[in-house]
A protein has these predicted regions:
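Hydrophobic, well-ordered secondary-structure elements that form the walls
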Residues: 256, 299, 319, 327, ...
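Terminal RNA-binding accessory module
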Residues: 342-432
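Conserved glycine-rich "GG(E/T)P / GGGxP" loop and the immediately following alpha-helix
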Residues: 47-52, 189-216, 220, 232-239, ...
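Radical SAM/AdoMet-radical enzyme domain recognition
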Residues: 186, 211-212, 219-220, 225, ...
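Contiguous mid-protein beta-loop-alpha structural module that forms a pocket-lining wall or clamp
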Residues: 307, 322-324
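Short, surface-exposed connector motifs at secondary-structure boundaries
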Residues: 2, 67-68, 220-227
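Conserved strand-turn element in the central/C-terminal portion of the radical SAM core barrel
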Residues: 160-167, 225-234, 260-270, 291-311, ...
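Proteins enriched for Cys/Gly/acidic motifs involved in redox and nucleic-acid/cofactor modification
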Residues: 1-202, 239, 244, 250, ...
Length: 432
């Protein structure tokens, strides 16, 4: 039997898809690409935006057109957040949520065997539930491994449907994380990325902390780089920063969630910090890791309800002033079940899209300038994608994309380079 996966959304979703693929392989299935015909099609959905829901439905329709006899599965955040709507999608033979992923295999078998015509298996998240272990040892990139350490979010930001889609904070057992890291190191992975729905919340439900996990992860032989997923700035304290800076394996690249550079908009979004507090945390990280050594990335929403032109200009000024290496810009998506859904002064779609284009153009200029400022510096690069026998793309510790000729090296090697010119997509570099 052949199974294929279509994944939308964040690194956590990608990690979970990989774990599901491994589960199906271990039970006799062959995992194939989206372009190949399959007996089972699994859509791992994202519901952060309306567009994500639309793409999930579109892919299910495509799967049924390609193979009307196949079993189609809709799983993940979309069904969990909107179970009634998801259950009505006729093209989905199996509908499951963001929990109890192990049951997908059994649900699929029920339909394949004719025991059930359709399976709707969406289970509500409950307070006190435990982290669901989904072991994973193989990654498509073969060089960087994503390790999920936490699920759920206890915050209630006005725009965000994720707490509804993912449930409360649930931390993975520390011993389980470290055991997976040891397996990955034995398999040759040199860089790991700790991913989560609310990464700084790790350990808040189990008496430990993210910093403790980072320190112990750094002790795993063979792991040379540790990278962090998204961080909420207000959850980073002075002692956390001091301890993280002492971990030499920790990549000095921080994805600090911002969402807006306007204080009025941040208050409306129910984000628990001001732009001044955000800038202060970034300044402390720069001081601890070295101003020329650290980089920042972030997410920004434009067109939030009530955002005036002046608010947008203030946000853009703050964002460009922070000198982010990369910014993900999103036009606000109105999500049912969130506080902002009922806010007055909803902006028209064309205005949100226009602001998205303006913000994107501004942050791309900053990205190019930041990359150009690194020209001539020495950096270590993890070789990832071979373009030829000797040419590779890869990333520095600061997550700067690099193109380098490295004869005699292979994917997965870490090499020392001198950074060169920025070509609009990546830095050209030469081996030291």
């Amino acid at each position: 039997m052949r199974v294929t996966f279509y994944t939308l959304g964040c690194k956590v979703n990608q990690n979970e898809t990989g774990a599901l693929a491994q589960l199906f392989e271990e039970n006799g299935y062959t995992v194939v690409s989206n372009e190949e015909g399959a007996d089972v099609y699994i859509v791992n959905s994202c519901t952060v935006t309306n567009f994500g829901d639309q793409k999930s439905r579109k892919w299910l329709r495509r799967a049924k057109r390609e193979n009307p006899g196949a079993v189609t599965v809709l799983t993940g955040c979309y069904p969990q957040a909107f179970p009634d709507e998801a259950a009505e999608i006729a093209e989905a033979d199996v509908v499951t949520g963001s929990g109890n992923r192990h049951a997908i295999l059994t649900d699929v078998q029920k339909v394949l065997n004719g025991e059930e015509e359709r399976v709707i298996d969406i289970r509500p998240h409950e307070k006190g539930e435990r982290f669901e272990e989904l072991p994973m040892d193989k990654f498509a990139e073969h060089t960087r491994a994503f390790v999920k350490v936490e699920d759920g979010c206890n915050r209630r930001c006005a725009y965000c449907v994720i707490p509804r889609a993912r449930g409360p904070v649930r931390s993975r057992n520390e011993a389980s994380v470290l055991e997976e890291l040891r397996r990955l190191a034995d398999a040759g992975y040199k860089e790991v990325v700790l991913t989560a729905i609310s990464l700084p919340s790790y350990g808040t439900d189990s008496g430990t902390s993210l910093v403790e996990l980072i320190e112990k992860a750094a002790e795993v032989p063979g792991i040379e780089r540790i990278r962090l997923g998204s961080l909420d700035p207000d959850m980073l304290h002075d002692d956390d920063i001091r301890r993280m800076a002492a971990v030499k394996k920790l990549c000095p690249q921080f994805h600090l969630s911002l969402q807006s550079g306007c204080d009025k908009t941040l208050r409306a979004m129910r984000r628990p910090y001001t732009t001044a507090q955000y800038a202060d945390i970034a300044a402390k990280l720069r001081a601890a890791f070295g101003a020329d050594n650290v980089s920042f990335t972030t997410d920004v929403i434009v067109g939030f309800p009530g955002e005036t032109e002046d608010d947008f200009e203030a946000s853009m000024a703050f964002v460009t002033g922070m000198r982010f290496l990369k910014v993900h810009v999103f036009p606000y998506s109105r999500r049912e079940g969130t506080a902002a859904y009922d806010f007055a002064d909803q902006l028209p779609e064309h205005e949100k899209e226009a602001r998205s284009r303006r913000m994107t153009a501004a942050v791309e200029e900053v990205r190019a300038a930041e990359a150009a400022a690194m020209q001539g510096r020495k950096a270590s690069v993890l070789l990832e994608t071979p373009l030829s026998a000797t040419m590779f793309t890869g990333y520095t510790k600061q997550y700067l994309p690099v193109l380098v000729s490295a004869p005699g090296h292979k994917t997965g090697d870490i090499v020392e380079v001198t950074l060169g010119a920025w070509d609009g997509k990546r830095c050209r570099a030469e081996l030291v």
